């Protein structure tokens, strides 16, 4: 069994491998993991130590083999030049907590719809409407983020969802 790297303990890719090793002992060491992933052992070490940024294809391979779809989101939101400015990092909570967040963000959806209709009815956004419109956009962003997190949770934990 490989020993745990203390230098890479906070690295998302190393953490994903350690989690996968709980289910598959082949992921306990970089030496055993590298050929499974098709990534050179030294390159894998440098990725896990934060010295190299993995290629998107490598992240997809890790995600598939480790069963951790959340590392794709982490890659996009932290490392990808385009994603850093457009993708929010999602955090997988327990299902009950996640459902409460989703339900909380949906509770005011009817008022949100009404506000959007009021803002858009004259075909332009005036001074006072702009502040309200920005608030609507933020609420929609919260709904979207909660929906994406729920989809990520389902992809990780529900086998039927994974096969689609």
Regions found by a protein language model. Name each.
Residues 3, 75-107, 157-164:
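Short, charged recognition helix plus adjacent turn
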Residues 21-46:
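Short alpha-helical DNA-recognition segment
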Residues 60, 100-110, 134-148:
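Generic structural signal for well-ordered, non-transmembrane alpha-helical segments
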Residues 16, 36, 47-50, 74:
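Residues in the recognition helix of alpha-helical DNA-binding motifs
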Residues 57-75:
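DNA major-groove recognition helix of helix-turn-helix/homeodomain DNA-binding modules
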Residues 90-95, 110-135:
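Acidic, glycine-anchored loop motifs typical of Ca2+
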Residues 1-26, 139:
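A short, Lys/Arg-rich alpha-helix, primarily the initiator
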Residues 129-164:
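Charged, low-complexity intrinsically disordered regulatory/assembly segments
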């Amino acid at each position: 069994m490989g020993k745990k790297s203390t230098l890479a303990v906070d690295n998302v890719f190393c953490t994903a491998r350690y989690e996968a090793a709980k289910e598959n002992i082949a992921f306990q060491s970089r030496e055993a993991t590298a050929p499974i992933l098709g990534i050179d052992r030294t390159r894998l070490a440098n990725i896990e130590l934060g010295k190299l940024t993995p290629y998107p294809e490598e992240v997809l391979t890790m995600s598939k083999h480790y069963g951790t779809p959340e590392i794709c989101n982490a890659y996009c939101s932290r490392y990808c030049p385009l994603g850093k400015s457009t993708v929010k990092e999602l955090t997988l909570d327990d299902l009950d907590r996640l459902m409460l967040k989703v339900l909380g963000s949906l509770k005011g959806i009817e008022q949100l719809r009404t506000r959007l209709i009021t803002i858009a009815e004259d075909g332009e956004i005036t001074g006072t409407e702009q502040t309200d419109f920005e608030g609507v956009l933020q609420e929609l962003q919260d709904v979207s983020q909660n929906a994406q997190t729920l989809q990520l949770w389902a992809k990780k934990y529900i086998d039927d969802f994974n096969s689609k």
